[in-house]
Amino acid sequence: MSLTNEQIIEAIGQKSVMEIVELIKAMEETFGVTAAAAVAAGPAAAAPAAEEQTEFTIVLAEAGDKKVNVIKAVRELTGLGLKEAKAVVDGAPGVVKEGVSKEEAEAAKKALEEAGAKVELK
């Protein structure tokens, strides 16, 4: 049996506020939606310009096959000792350096990739 829109509205109108809230939650879960109202932007409302990221984190995703070369590259970039650099490489994925400029991050990524590592900038 299929209900008409009028029958559904009438049935909802007979429910208490708490029952309607429960119904909304059930509908959100069932259909994977939210009941938040859509806000229409006026013509004068412009989207704010996306700020360019200024600080990056260099993340060693994978050391690759040339682990010794990657350890050397990590030591050069960070100034860490052999043991500490090896721990960073062995612990991949992990952070190599944080809060660096875009230029430094790109240079570090290039050096690590040339050494055989897979690198991400965040």
UniProtKB/Swiss-Prot annotation:
Keywords attached to this entry: Ribonucleoprotein, Ribosomal protein
GO molecular-function term, one example from the UniProt record: structural constituent of ribosome
Domain of life of the native organism: Bacteria
One cellular component (GO) term of this entry: cytosolic large ribosomal subunit
Pfam families: Ribosomal_L12, Ribosomal_L12_N
InterPro entries on file: Ribosomal_bL12, Ribosomal_bL12_C, Ribosomal_bL12_C/ClpS-like, Ribosomal_bL12_oligo, Ribosomal_bL12_oligo_N_sf
SUPFAM superfamilies, A to Z: ClpS-like, Ribosomal protein L7/12, oligomerisation (N-terminal) domain
A GO BP entry: translation
NCBIfam families associated with the record: L12
Its biological purpose: Forms part of the ribosomal stalk which helps the ribosome interact with GTP-bound translation factors. Is thus essential for accurate translation.
HAMAP family the record matches: Ribosomal_bL12
Subunit structure of this chain's protein: Homodimer. Part of the ribosomal stalk of the 50S ribosomal subunit. Forms a multimeric L10(L12)X complex, where L10 forms an elongated spine to which 2 to 4 L12 dimers bind in a sequential fashion. Binds GTP-bound translation factors.
Family assignment from sequence similarity: Belongs to the bacterial ribosomal protein bL12 family.
Protein name: Large ribosomal subunit protein bL12
